[in-house]
């Protein structure tokens, strides 16, 4: 059991149960998975850039990234069906808790001019998405070896039904929201 998961069980669950008046402990929202995605677009035509993105995302996540491919052909983007356009990783269980801890305590504070993450990233069902412009904020990557800076999307999927429940869950876990 990771540090953050233990904190969730001991402190966050009772606080959420008290605040939202859940009758059963099973009603308390939890984090189900975290999805990391790097979309490369046109740059994905270069095998070198694609391999670099896959290896860097694998280093960040701690498990192998898979290539995402185009579902449809779009002539204006010079895109054909099946062409590689990015890579992604889905984290669950212990790796998910480790990554979330690392994201909130190490990576986000390293962002330039960081004042907190926006609360506008909720989707209406309690899930939270945030975009990062530079993936070099993660401690696993050596800044000297990075040739191209890449952005990434991080989606935190929760079992919360409402955005308010999801926000309180992430807030209690320590997500640095803008005040």
Curated annotation (Swiss-Prot):
According to its record, what are the GO cellular component terms?
Answer: ribonucleoprotein complex; ribosome
UniProt keyword Phosphoprotein present: no
What would be an example GO MF term here?
A: tRNA binding
- Give the PROSITE patterns listed for this entry: RIBOSOMAL_L5 (PS00358)
Name a single GO biological process: translation
- Look up keyword RNA-binding and say if it applies: yes
The cross-references to InterPro entries, in alphabetical order and at most eight, read: Ribosomal_uL5 (IPR002132), Ribosomal_uL5_bac-type (IPR020930), Ribosomal_uL5_C (IPR031309), Ribosomal_uL5_CS (IPR020929), Ribosomal_uL5_dom_sf (IPR022803), Ribosomal_uL5_N (IPR031310)
Which controlled-vocabulary keywords does the entry list? Ribonucleoprotein, Ribosomal protein, RNA-binding, rRNA-binding, tRNA-binding
What the record says about family reads: Belongs to the universal ribosomal protein uL5 family.
| Assembly, per entry | Part of the 50S ribosomal subunit; part of the 5S rRNA/L5/L18/L25 subcomplex. Contacts the 5S rRNA and the P site tRNA. Forms a bridge to the 30S subunit in the 70S ribosome.
Q: What does this protein do?
A: This is one of the proteins that bind and probably mediate the attachment of the 5S RNA into the large ribosomal subunit, where it forms part of the central protuberance. In the 70S ribosome it contacts protein S13 of the 30S subunit (bridge B1b), connecting the 2 subunits; this bridge is implicated in subunit movement. Contacts the P site tRNA; the 5S rRNA and some of its associated proteins might help stabilize positioning of ribosome-bound tRNAs.
Tell me the protein's name. Answer: Large ribosomal subunit protein uL5
Give the organism, scientific name: Lawsonia intracellularis (strain PHE/MN1-00)
Lineage of the source organism? Bacteria, Pseudomonadati, Thermodesulfobacteriota, Desulfovibrionia, Desulfovibrionales
């Amino acid at each position: 059991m990771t540090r953050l998961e233990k904190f969730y069980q001991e402190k966050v669950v009772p606080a959420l149960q008290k605040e939202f008046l859940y009758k059963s402990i099973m009603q308390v929202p939890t984090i189900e998975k975290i999805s990391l995605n790097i979309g490369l677009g046109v740059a994905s035509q270069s095998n070198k850039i694609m391999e670099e993105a896959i290896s860097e995302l694998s280093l960040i996540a701690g498990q192998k990234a898979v290539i995402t491919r185009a579902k449809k052909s779009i002539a204006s983007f010079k895109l054909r069906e099946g062409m590689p356009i990015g890579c992604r990783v889905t984290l669950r269980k212990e790796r998910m808790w480790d990554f979330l801890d690392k994201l909130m305590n190490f990576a986000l504070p390293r962002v330039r001019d960081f004042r907190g993450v926006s609360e506008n990233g909720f989707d209406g069902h309690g899930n939270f998405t945030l975009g990062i412009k530079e993936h070099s904020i993660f401690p696993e990557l050596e800044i000297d070896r990075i040739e191209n800076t890449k952005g990434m999307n991080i989606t935190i999927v929760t079992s919360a039904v409402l955005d308010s429940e999801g926000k309180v869950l992430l807030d209690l876990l320590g997500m640095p929201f803008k005040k």
